[in-house]
């Protein structure tokens, strides 16, 4: 189990085999990393397409055993494409080496994204801002571990369960630099010139002396 609280709601996520689900405020204690066995009566509900289980009049802990454990659930190494395909819903995942970006939707308020080429998902720092997402730098590469626990306007959201860490560059910057080095060269009149041309030129959108 992974347990957190959000505005008075107890969010408990459990995994069985390759499937996970949220147990939302069932009314009895299920500590972090505990193992649940038995059965419990609940209602299945959906929040923007994400399933969760919630208490009803018959919910109690009489037929369920909660065994505390120190062994934490291992995150699944996933990709942005996996989440866009709705894999690992409600499960604990790690996404490595994504590029961070943000978009201002209201003055001083931002949506945050993990990008992989043309694809992206949102990062929602829901649980006490443990991920430190607001302090990340646009264009930098990071790793995030969290729950694929929400979908916002059709876009998957990962909810960090620990601080976002620095990733490893995949060499894209070197490819970009090489492309700039090989960019065509123009003089100030807009005529294409060769590397032997002397004077002020425009290359890759920048003026320079050659």
Annotate the PLM regions:
Residues 16, 116, 188, 203-204:
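Structural motif
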Residues 86-88, 178-181, 195:
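Short, small/polar residue-rich loop motifs at catalytic or cofactor-binding pockets
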Residues 200-210:
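C-terminal tail/sorting-segment detector
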Residues 166-189:
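Residue-level detector of functionally pivotal "anchor" positions at catalytic/ligand-binding pockets or at interdomain
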Residues 97, 198-201:
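Terminal short linear interaction segments
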Residues 1-172:
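OB-fold nucleic-acid-binding modules
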Residues 11, 111, 182-184, 200:
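Conserved beta-strand and immediately adjacent loop positions that scaffold enzyme active sites
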